């Protein structure tokens, strides 16, 4: 009787494990990102990814709409050793389930910009009042609605370099801050969990710090307008430099008292080729990790601006460039600090109240009140993202991959499964649709998911072993 009882309990525990989600969500705790299950700090070690440039987004395609292209590139992401990609533009009217599932299985998270170059899908930095309307907000909300249902969506960027010169600094700041709050209100009303909203700043010392302080500050009337994280686009470390000659020491000091997570949303100067990426060793060292939460190298694919890690050839093959190998050698040797270490080194700060003015910025603006409130109340119509059952063949690529010398690359041609998706991952969205009253429960469930990929096969084996005791 005792054997039966213990075996029965074990069987129940295994079934519970199989029904819990495997893809851990990432949330913000103090000034860093944290894995909600393990409690370990999450440092961004990634690349910016927009094959063909932002102009390649259309009604028919975007970077996450082609599963074959995703399989080809995600296995190369794994070869680099990254854990995050940033994508600048997508079309929410396309299906992204296969590519997001592949990223999740590969253990890779997404930071997604909500704007696109298509009409009515971005802010006019010089005349934002002409574009900040309900048509634009509907596009933004559709992006948020769709991607908030993937556990590996790490965060959203409300804008990229919208403020980048004297003229835009006079007109755009207030609209960016308003957009951040409006997005957060929509997430609070409709998303299954809280997903942070940030901004990616231009590499311009005239505005970078003052804009960060303005977007950070808390207005008593609209506390939700405070940014959740801040991205810095920086290209000041070129070739062989030091913290002092590159100006990184000044950069770190500028954000030392910032109350939100800060990271490089773009980095990797290309004035010296091949790029050495020497700054990565410092970025994840004690000199910087108390202030910066990692970064994203610009960029994965070779475009006209010559920052690529790989180059797509006319015959559909892909060639790894010298920068790819350099970045790989640095990323694969990174060790993240522990939470204990961070607590000993990170200076915690309170979010400041808003000041009356900020250097080089004009923050007064007459933005229409309650714009988007009706959309927030009723929600937008878009296909909600969900993980799908991916066949093993879909994780492989038949594309010819060449090394930097033009010879056939002898690396893997298949995505390595690092997170096996469970029934909860694959069916969670259907359950949410069936019972909207369980939203609060779902939020708790997603934030308390506990099984990681390698444990799932073990759980299955133990489950079958348990059954064998009876038959």
Curated annotation (Swiss-Prot):
Per UniProt, what is the membrane topology? Lipid-anchor; GPI-anchor
Where is (1,3-beta-D-glucosyl)n 1 bound in this sequence?
88, 160, 298
Give glycosylation sites per the record.
151, 398
Active site (record annotation)? 161 (proton donor), 266 (nucleophile)
Q: Which Gene3D superfamilies match?
A: Glycosidases
Please identify the protein, giving its name as recorded.
1,3-beta-glucanosyltransferase GAS4
What PANTHER family does its record include?
Answer: 1,3-BETA-GLUCANOSYLTRANSFERASE GAS1, 1,3-BETA-GLUCANOSYLTRANSFERASE GAS4
EC number(s) per entry = 2.4.1.-
What GO molecular function annotation could you give as one example from this UniProt entry? 1,3-beta-glucanosyltransferase activity
Gene designation per UniProt: GAS4
* InterPro entries found in the cross-reference section: Glucanosyltransferase, Glycoside_hydrolase_SF
Species annotation: Saccharomyces cerevisiae (strain ATCC 204508 / S288c)
- For the ligand ((1,3-beta-D-glucosyl)n 2), the binding residues are 161, 203, 208
Lipid-substituted positions (GPI-anchor amidated asparagine):
447
Q: Can the keyword Transmembrane be found in this entry's annotation?
A: no
